[in-house]
């Protein structure tokens, strides 16, 4: 379903909320653990939740397994092309789990390199609990985000039929793509515009890279990869000064901090006139970051699906912890200041931020998942 159609469907559902309140109340059910959900079928997901929190996310951590689970949501969902369908070709099924079902094909596509590890970790849970791969990928991504302090309350809907064929190659953006290419790709996938593209990249706040630089694994995009905050949008605007590893890799540019990686697409989107002001708008604005990402994550997880035929099981997703009280929403890391910022937004000045005390240090790598 095209993104604008999705927005219309969501708006219609919201407009009917009051009128259908009595019906919704009757449908609500109490699960065996005492939790109340919007539909009795959602209760089974609490068992999945307990299992993956303990045995996939290492007791509910915002670590490598969580980061890769979030990445998997995007790579599964964005593989849909109405433009290809209009040409009589199969354009992929969007958020249908095809990347896991056809794990001998899609993980071998260049932008998906490295996702085989999280797919192999997730598949036993899919088989154990008898859920569809598409639903599990969306669920694991939402739970993963809930483990990251500062993240929004994530939505989760069930009702995805398993994919019947793999998505075609070439539908997942690459780190070396131009801004024009990426905007065109997300517009084709769901009629997303350049602002909504920036919202998607909020996920890089809790992310790391394993396969851009083959010499170094677990390189984060910002200095707080375990917290869903706007540091990613601050630090990608720092002047590039070094490579954290070998350098000269396709899709990588110099980063502004030791131990931190910067991919070409993030660098150019932070500086392009079409996206720079939206990029900067997240700096020191946690409420906007949270609300925009909550919206775009739901839209991504429903690409290729009919929202009206799905069941809202968002009650199962935990509420994330707040950002630690000893940190501001946005800040300059030790040793950094306004003089390090390459501001690209011509409309508004860069927000005034405090510089944390102490000496400049290298950003720590993210340990890989066990067995990876």
Curated annotation (Swiss-Prot):
Catalytic class of the enzyme: oxidoreductase
Cofactor annotation: heme b; Ca(2+)
EC number: 1.11.1.14
Residues the record marks as site: Transition state stabilizer: 71
Pathway: Secondary metabolite metabolism; lignin degradation
Catalytic activity: 1-(3,4-dimethoxyphenyl)-2-(2-methoxyphenoxy)propane-1,3-diol + H2O2 = 3,4-dimethoxybenzaldehyde + guaiacol + glycolaldehyde + H2O; 2 (3,4-dimethoxyphenyl)methanol + H2O2 = 2 (3,4-dimethoxyphenyl)methanol radical + 2 H2O
Active site residues of this protein: 75 (proton acceptor)
Signal peptide range in chain numbering: 1-21
Functional pH dependence: Optimum pH is 2.5.
Binding site for Ca(2+) 1: 76, 94, 96, 98
Keywords assigned by UniProt, alphabetized: Calcium, Cleavage on pair of basic residues, Disulfide bond, Glycoprotein, Heme, Hydrogen peroxide, Iron, Lignin degradation, Metal-binding, Oxidoreductase, Peroxidase, Signal, Zymogen
Family (UniProt): Belongs to the peroxidase family. Ligninase subfamily.
Protein name (Swiss-Prot/TrEMBL): Ligninase A
Gene name as annotated: LIPA
